[in-house]
């Protein structure tokens, strides 16, 4: 078969999957950072540090367990707008600038169909932290709370941390 025909032959099954409502799997990132609220109470963080990772975020994921979250860093600071498209569980969104929480969107509502509401303050932020709904209040996090995101060393040969409900990598 000619190369052009091969390309069309490979594209058709992919198009069929999209038209049939194929949904890509959720992303599971390793724990590479933490935010310690006290010396003995740290939130383990997946870091969505690329545009692709940020666009997927926590879509299609089950509820986050306590003391787990996803960090979305922005350098340079940006006007960040988040939505809950294809995110089945409510979240708390903490918007961070200059090492402190500048805004909180608590108990954001899942949105399984477009259009979806967007969340975010009318100011640039250095990053956004997503936690399970209710965790900000439960942990005593409020606007003005200091934020210190620190890297976590991953041990070579050890699989990345993931919740028990997460599927094992192929």
Residue ranges and their predicted role:
Residues 9-20:
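Bacterial N-terminal signal peptides
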């Amino acid at each position: 078969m000619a190369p052009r025909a091969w390309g069309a032959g490979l594209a058709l099954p992919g198009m069929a999957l999209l038209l049939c409502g194929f949904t890509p799997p959720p992303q599971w990132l390793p724990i590479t950072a933490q935010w310690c609220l006290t010396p003995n109470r740290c939130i383990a963080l997946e870091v969505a540090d690329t545009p692709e990772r940020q666009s997927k975020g926590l879509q299609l994921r089950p509820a986050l367990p306590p003391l787990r979250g996803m960090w979305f860093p922005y350098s340079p600071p940006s006007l960040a707008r988040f939505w809950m498209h294809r995110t089945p569980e409510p979240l708390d969104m903490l918007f961070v600038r200059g090492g402190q929480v500048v805004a909180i969107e608590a108990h954001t509502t899942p949105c399984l169909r477009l259009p979806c509401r967007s969340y975010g303050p009318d100011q640039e932020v250095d990053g956004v932290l997503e936690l399970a709904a209710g965790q900000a209040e439960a942990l005593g996090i409020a606007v003005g709370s200091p934020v210190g995101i620190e890297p976590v060393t991953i041990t070579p040969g050890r699989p990345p941390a993931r919740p028990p409900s997460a599927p094992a990598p192929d």
